[in-house]
Amino acid sequence: MLSVLVIFLLLAIPAELFAKAETSKITIKGTDLSAPIEIRDPKTLANFAVWTGTGTGCTPCPPPSPESFIVDWSQPMADHPTGLHRYEVSFYAKIPDERLIYVVFYEYDPATEHGYVYFPGRTEEWYRLNVNTIFHGVEGKWFRAWSAWEGVARPLIAGSNALRRGTRC
C-alpha cells in the first residue's frame, strides 16, 4: 500500500519537482536557420526561467515581474503582424537528466523592431507538454517579447542567417 502511495505522489507532483530545476539549455529552430541555435551559457540562461511570470504565483507571493521568462507580460497582443519568420524556442532542464520542458514560438518584425511570443493553445502541438510543466493561463495568446530576450535572440538569429548566406558576422 505504501509503494502505491509513493508512486501516486511521484506522478501527481512532477511540476513541483521541476520548479527547482534551472533552465539548462534553450534551442531556437527556424526554417531560415541553417542549424538550430543552442544557448548553454549559465549566466544567459539564468534570465529566462520557465517558472516565472503569469500563472506562477501563489496567494501570499508578490505579483510576478512584468518582464520575465522571455515575455513582457504587461503587453498582451490581440493580434500581431503576419508574414514574419517563426522560430520554435525550446527550454530544457536537468531533472535529473536533461529533458525538454517547455516550447513557445517567437517572431520578430524588423519594420517595428518588436518581437512577439506565442504560447501554443489547447489544440496545438506542445500545449500538453507545456501545461504539464506549468499552466500559465495564457495558452493560445501572443505577447510582446521581453527586451532582454530580444537582446539575446536577435543577434544569434541574425548571425546564423548571415552564416547561412555565406557572409561573416
Regions picked out by a protein language model, each given a short descriptive name:
Residues 2-12:
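Bacterial N-terminal signal peptides
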Residues 16-169:
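Function-determining sites in protein domains
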